[in-house]
């Protein structure tokens, strides 16, 4: 074990030594660069781009480019990159993760690789966790880039189409993970290529990379519209779930946050709902699954609150109320049914992608954070990125004290309050990290009773949050915050605080991941400042209750310790960290397993979006249309012929009617007399292709090519939306296959493939029906109308997608955007048809 750790440390040290040689080269250039005039320094950008065109690589330019950014930063911001920041910049350029402690200037580090990679002209995305940080960095660090002649863009909440397009056209674009992901989805819903805003996904630098690529990796970004689905099944399930018995009819795994029916439970549910086979009814299976989750896993006032007749989600990490946000996949409706509230309309998913799959599409991906090494295996396996620990600029002075363990939560919080009171009397600032809004308010009440003035950080805007966190290092300040609050904002010590021991960080509970605890510790001891940290733990905490409190409980019992007596030892701290390692490994396994399911959907999305992009960009579809005709004819003949060899035994009337309706060709039974199946197929293919060639002459080549493009995009989008819903139901019902001794993942892959093939066949059939039947007058009118509608719809989707989300990044629950017109709503064109059967499909 120690040999393995030694190798890891040696590898990191070797990396640093190797990069230090380049740092020495950059340092040797500094005197020469300092003598350059502003104009000469700015001209370096033009020179570098010319050298790239002449065949030099970015690696060739790196030392000079980094020297240029360092000197520009010194002149513009008065900030000179430290040597360790140059090393961090090189690590990011290599597509790796730079682990840099809090206060070491990660924001300034990002200017180095972003400038270098922007020289290619292909764009660089700098990704932050919220709008406040994106705006701050674009304005602050953007001054360096603008001085050097680069354009800087900003993607935040509330921008219109033109502003977004301009921001993405810039050399370097700052923005949040959610905004980048939503823009990608919206780009894959447009009808005209000029409505797209993003360029290719070239290079991304992800700030707080652990938060975005691990904590929120599976957060689905969803653009949705209302589906108006019936709600009776939610109420029916809500009535029967309370009649089921835990551990008999269903089993809850708190560690895995999952609930499953037992075989007995399946039988009881089938009987109570009056259905024969739950596994065969994906819709009922989906409702039961979500109902079980709502009743057994989702707790009122922890996971959500009920306010004014609505279910409001509580963010697990920050404790904020997520107004306007809803759980997806029917879970929100199931909770509404459980609470006896009016069920709001379920949403129809129009487009979706997880952050994990979005960021894996970049040609080069890098990230920075204060805490990543503990998750390196996951970064390597999922994103192919290793972690390099960057040395601090000044030696660390922070003292991390051993954990203190109490028998009860009440005993623990009393001890925390006592410790805060003592520190407050000394004038030493204290930052207390809690795991939930409930716990922070509980602690706040105790401090009020002791007369200790303090600030509580929850459900505040980022601007206010950053201000509170920034002031948390002032003398006598007591700040209570959720563990994740205030990331990206440095806590600077006030006058005289260093002499008092610096900022004292108290953790009131160990998180499942060591990384989250390390983030809290990292608020103290920035840039060589003094500081201290300690965690207070009770045997009633979730981590201790679920993972290994028995041994410590035994020790406390033998010693006859009461609630107010703690155990404090390095051995206890190590035991807790071992429990965390086990949880981390289990969580990684769960995420890997879930990713196997996600990858199936992701592969299908890539196929659809890739084909869609080719159509959007004006690829000639004539050959594609003729391939569709050949395939559909073959399917038609096989369907109506069945196993019969002779034409006389086929269902000829139905086949001929189908051919006339679909291909607009009149064929009689006599035309097929004495033909074999292959001859019939060839005959119909030739007839249909001839008819389509006539359509080309009737409509004109230019008109029919544009019609093909618009109609195919509409039909694909319509069927893709329905496919997303079907896949979602399949995903939630597939677990029941395990009762039949079948591997759910294998079954899911098989059925997903079959469903995808069926969707493709349906797309081809519906597309051809439109193309054979549309006439020239309607085509011209519809085309003009469609362009106007497409543009209006793009604006509506964009506006609503942004308006229905809050600014910050959200773990666990999906992030949604909802356009106004639902697919089952009446079409706004006034036809009287449903939108999905009218302008939601055709062009």
UniProtKB/Swiss-Prot annotation:
EC number: 7.4.2.8
Cofactor(s) demanded: Zn(2+)
Chief localisation class: membrane
Superkingdom per UniProt: Bacteria
Basic and acidic residues compositional bias, start-end: 802-823
Cofactor binding: number and manner: May bind 1 zinc ion per subunit.
InterPro entries (UniProt xref): Helicase_ATP-bd, Helicase_C-like, P-loop_NTPase, SEC_C_motif, SecA, SecA_CS, SecA_DEAD, SecA_motor_DEAD
Residue sites binding ATP per the record: 85, 103-107, 490
Keywords: ATP-binding, Cell membrane, Cytoplasm, Membrane, Metal-binding, Nucleotide-binding, Protein transport, Translocase, Translocation, Transport, Zinc
Name this polypeptide is given: Protein translocase subunit SecA
Protein role: Part of the Sec protein translocase complex. Interacts with the SecYEG preprotein conducting channel. Has a central role in coupling the hydrolysis of ATP to the transfer of proteins into and across the cell membrane, serving as an ATP-driven molecular motor driving the stepwise translocation of polypeptide chains across the membrane.
Organism: Heliobacterium modesticaldum (strain ATCC 51547 / Ice1)
Single GO term (MF): metal ion binding
SMART domains, sorted: SecA_DEAD (SM00957), SecA_PP_bind (SM00958)
GO biological process, any: protein import
Lipid bilayer topology: Peripheral membrane protein
Gene3D superfamilies membership: Helical scaffold and wing domains of SecA, P-loop containing nucleotide triphosphate hydrolases, SecA, preprotein cross-linking domain
Region (Disordered): 799-834
One Gene Ontology cellular component: cytosol
Catalytic activity from the UniProt record: ATP + H2O + cellular proteinSide 1 = ADP + phosphate + cellular proteinSide 2
């Amino acid at each position: 074990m120690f040999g393995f750790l030694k190798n890891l440390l040696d590898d990191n040290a070797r990396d640093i030594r190797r990069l230090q040689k380049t740092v020495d080269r950059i340092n040797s250039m500094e005197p020469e660069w300092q003598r350059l005039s502003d104009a000469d320094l700015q001209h370096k950008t033009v020179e570098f781009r010319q050298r790239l065109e002449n065949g030099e690589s970015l690696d060739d330019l790196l030392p000079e480019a980094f020297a240029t950014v360092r000197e520009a930063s010194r002149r513009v911001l008065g900030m000179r990159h430290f040597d360790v920041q140059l090393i961090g910049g090189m690590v990011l350029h290599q597509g790796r993760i730079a682990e840099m402690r809090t206060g070491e200037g990660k924001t300034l580090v990002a200017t180095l690789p972003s400038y270098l990679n922007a020289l290619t002209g292909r764009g660089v995305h700098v990704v932050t966790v919220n709008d406040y940080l994106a705006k701050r960095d674009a304005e602050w660090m953007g001054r360096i880039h603008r001085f050097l002649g680069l354009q800087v863009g900003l993607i935040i909440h509330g921008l219109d189409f033109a502003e977004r397009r301009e921001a993405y056209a810039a050399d370097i674009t700052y923005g949040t993970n959610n905004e980048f992901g939503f823009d990608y989805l919206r780009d894959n819903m447009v009808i005209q290529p000029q409505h797209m805003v993003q360029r290719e996904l070239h290079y991304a630098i992800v700030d707080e990379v652990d938060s975005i690529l691990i904590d929120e990796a599976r957060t689905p970004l969803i653009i949705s519209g209302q589906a108006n689905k019936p709600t009776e099944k939610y109420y029916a399930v809500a009535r029967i779930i309370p009649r089921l018995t835990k551990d008999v009819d269903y089993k809850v795994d708190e560690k895995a946050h999952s609930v499953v029916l037992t075989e007995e439970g399946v039988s009881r549910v089938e009987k109570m709902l009056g259905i024969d086979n739950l596994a065969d009814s994906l819709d009922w299976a989906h409702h039961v699954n979500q109902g079980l989750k709502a009743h057994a896993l989702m707790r009122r006032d922890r996971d959500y609150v009920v306010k004014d007749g609505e279910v409001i989600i509580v963010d697990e990490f920050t404790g904020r109320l997520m107004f306007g946000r809803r759980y997806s996949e029917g879970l929100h409706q199931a909770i509404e049914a459980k609470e006896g509230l009016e069920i709001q309309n379920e949403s129809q998913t129009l487009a979706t992608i997880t952050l994990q799959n979005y960021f894996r599409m970049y040609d080069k991906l890098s990230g920075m954070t204060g805490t990543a090494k503990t998750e390196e295996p996951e970064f390597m396996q999922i994103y192919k990125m290793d972690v390099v620990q960057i040395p601090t600029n000044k030696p660390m002075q922070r003292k991390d004290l051993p954990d203190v363990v109490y028998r009860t939560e009440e005993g623990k919080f009393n001890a925390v309050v006592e410790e805060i009171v003592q520190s407050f009397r000394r004038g030493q600032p204290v930052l207390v990290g809690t795991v939930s809004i409930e716990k922070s308010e509980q602690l706040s009440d105790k401090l009020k009773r002791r007369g200790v003035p303090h600030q509580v950080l929850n459900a505040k805007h980022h601007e206010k949050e950053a201000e509170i966190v920034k002031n948390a290092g002032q003398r006598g300040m007591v700040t209570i915050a959720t563990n994740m609050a205030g990331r990206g904002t440095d806590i600077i010590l006030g006058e005289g605080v260093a002499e008092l021991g610096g900022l004292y960080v108290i953790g009131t509970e160990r998180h499942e991941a060591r990384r989250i605890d390390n983030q809290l510790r990292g608020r103290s001891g920035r840039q060589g400042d003094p500081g201290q940290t300690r965690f207070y733990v009770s045997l009633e905490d979730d981590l201790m209750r679920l993972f290994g409190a028995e041994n410590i409980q035994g020790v406390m019992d033998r010693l006859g310790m009461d609630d107010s007596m703690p155990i404090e030892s390095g051995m206890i701290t190590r035991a807790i960290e071992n429990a965390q390692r086990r949880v981390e490994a289990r969580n990684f396994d769960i995420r890997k397993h879930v990713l196997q399911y996600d990858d199936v959907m992701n592969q299908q999305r890539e196929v659809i979006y890739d084909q869609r992009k080719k159509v959007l960009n004006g690829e000639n579809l004539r050959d594609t249309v003729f391939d569709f005709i050949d395939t559909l004819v073959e399917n038609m003949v096989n369907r109506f012929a069945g196993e019969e060899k002779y034409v006389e035994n086929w269902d000829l009337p139905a086949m001929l009617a189908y051919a006339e309706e679909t291909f607009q060709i009149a064929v009689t039974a006599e035309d097929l007399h004495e033909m074999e199946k292959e001859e019939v197929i060839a005959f119909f293919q030739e007839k249909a292709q001839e008819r389509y060639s006539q359509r080309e002459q009737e409509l004109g080549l230019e008109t029919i090519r544009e019609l093909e493009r618009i109609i195919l995009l509409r039909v694909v989008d319509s069927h893709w939306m329905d496919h997303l819903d079907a896949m979602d139901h399949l995903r939630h019902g597939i677990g029941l296959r395990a009762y039949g001794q079948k591997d759910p993942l294998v079954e899911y892959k098989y059925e997903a493939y079959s469903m995808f093939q069926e969707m493709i066949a349906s797309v081809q059939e519906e597309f051809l029906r439109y193309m054979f039947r549309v006439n020239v007058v309607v085509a011209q009118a519809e085309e003009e109308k469609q362009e106007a509608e497409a543009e209006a719809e793009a604006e509506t989707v964009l506006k609503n997608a942004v308006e229905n989300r809050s600014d910050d990044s959200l773990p666990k629950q999906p992030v949604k955007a909802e356009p106004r017109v639902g697919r089952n709503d009446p079409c706004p064109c006034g036809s009287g048809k449903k939108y999905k059967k009218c302008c939601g499909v055709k062009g």
